[in-house]
Amino acid sequence: EVGTMDERTVITIGREFGSGGHEIGMKLAEKLGIKCYDKELLELAAKESGLCEELFASQDEKPTNSFLYSLVMDTYSLGYTNSYVDMPINHKVFLAQFDAIKKLAERESCVIVGRCADYALEDNPYAVSVFIKASLDERVQRIKRIYELNDSKAADLIQKTDKRRASYYNYYSSKKWGEAKSYN
């Protein structure tokens, strides 16, 4: 069990698709007696922001190819627009998740899988960030088993999912997805 709020532990997990990162997060949380958030985080963010959950599901770890997040944030923080209402929907989704991650980390010990959580919590003294990797062969075998695919389709799904995750992470954070220096 994790101790009092003064001893709070927040572990963020980035992961390659098929590496078992989500499963590792769940087992780690169970062992520590804390919650693991992944898709649940989307629901929490949706409820707190008032945006519907279906909208969040469609934006789940998918980047946009429009202007950079930092530019958007500068524009909104400097007041060049009327309000949050004018913001593109994908940015609303990202900001709601970002906010939910920060609130969770302030409130409780937990494990958070994906969602640029390490970036959201980079200034949080209780947060530790890890990235889970596995060999391509191990990942293909795992994805084949889970999704009942052949080698080729499993490898294709891995490549597409990793590319999507990297694009999302690199787009919304100032770091590079999967690069050791981006994590603890």
Predicted features by range, described:
Residues 66-71, 150-184:
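Small-molecule kinase domains that catalyze NTP-dependent phosphoryl transfer to phosphate-bearing small molecules
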Residues 114-118:
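Short, polar loop motifs at secondary-structure junctions
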Residues 35-47:
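Short beta-strand-centered segment that lines the nucleotide-binding/catalytic pocket of NTP-utilizing
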Residues 123-146, 151-159:
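Conserved phosphate-donor/acceptor-positioning beta-strand/loop module used by diverse small-molecule
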Residues 46-109:
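ATP-dependent small-molecule kinase phosphotransfer cores
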Residues 13-28:
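Glycine-rich phosphate-binding P-loop
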